[in-house]
Amino acid sequence: MSSAPVLAHTREELATLLAAARARGEQVGLVPTMGALHEGHASLVRAARERVTDDGRMGPVVVSVFVNPLQFGANEDLDRYPRTLEADLEVCAREGADIVFAPSVDEVYPGGPPQVTVRPGPLGKILEGKVRPGHFRGVLTVVAKLFGLVRPDVAVFGQKDYQQLALIRRMVLDLALGVEIVAAETVREDDGLALSSRNRYLEPEQREQAVALSRALLAAQENAGYGAEVALDEARAELRAAPGVDLDYLVITDPDLDELPAVVPPGTPARILVAARVGGTRLIDNLPLMLGTRGPAGEASPPNRERSEPGSAEQNKSPGEARTTPSGTSEASE
């Protein structure tokens, strides 16, 4: 096991710890988290370590552990979100993090709730932003704050929170923050469920039901060569067959979360994203797609599955199910 990271609770402690590294010209890596660390977070720390190591000289990796109240809605799980700092320190030690920054709310927001925040713009109003108003304003504000406190050269985020990743990249571009954003692949359980700190809320039966999300995405990925409509049909079929899954949205977009064009050329990259509740736990997931290259054997449609055509009776979804739009995307019904 690597040596234990140094724990900093205040911005002054953090600045002192980073000063020597900056004087040596070392790069600084940041992994922002809300704690309750798991193997997905561990992979982010490893990615940060790799990016700040140059010719054997290792710059410091900072892991922030801060449950940010600004990104929780009134009826969300702020109070019960797991706080496991001692266990988090063990994960950070194992993965070679140098500093764990675990500030209080007053340390991050010394003037109380901030009066100046980062507005996410149009990209923050769709998907998660539509379901969780104000969420991304809180996320971007705290990330900008952490960038100011740590002043990292590199920051690592997971692709599981894909919309968040896209918004952070946009914020860095629009505000010229000068931080390299590294996207790390989603880490999954053996059965495909994306790792999440909220998975611990799931009862055993709900845990089994939750795998339907990744099964749906894989079904879409396997059939994306037939086009977006078929991919969505296959994903819907998996979700409909799964008990206990309450769908918020299922959507295929381009990699930047814009709508697909009306005509999708073969080999067009895309992203499928899903959000659903299993019991009282809200889960999200996503996968990349490559659209329009037809099936592996050149079939025009997938075997053993009749799919609906746009405008057919099958498109009359009940609330919460996916609905197809003319662009080939899909979003949850109101």
Curated annotation (Swiss-Prot):
Gene name?
A: panC
For this chain, the family text in UniProt reads: Belongs to the pantothenate synthetase family.
Annotated binding of (R)-pantoate, by residue: Q71, Q164
- What GO cellular component entries does it have? cytosol
Is the keyword Cytoplasm in the record? Answer: yes
A Pfam family recorded for this sequence? Pantoate_ligase
Name the reaction it catalyses: (R)-pantoate + beta-alanine + ATP = (R)-pantothenate + AMP + diphosphate + H(+)
Q: What else is known?
A: The reaction proceeds by a bi uni uni bi ping pong mechanism.
**Pathway it belongs to?**
Cofactor biosynthesis; (R)-pantothenate biosynthesis; (R)-pantothenate from (R)-pantoate and beta-alanine: step 1/1
- InterPro entries the UniProt entry points to: Pantoate_ligase, Pantoate_ligase_C, Rossmann-like_a/b/a_fold
Keyword field: ATP-binding, Cytoplasm, Ligase, Nucleotide-binding, Pantothenate biosynthesis
Asked if ATP-binding is a keyword of the record, the answer is yes
Provide ranges: composition bias, Polar residues. 313-334
Give, as one word, the top-level EC class.
ligase
Lineage runs:
Bacteria, Bacillati, Actinomycetota, Actinomycetes, Propionibacteriales
Record protein name field: Pantothenate synthetase
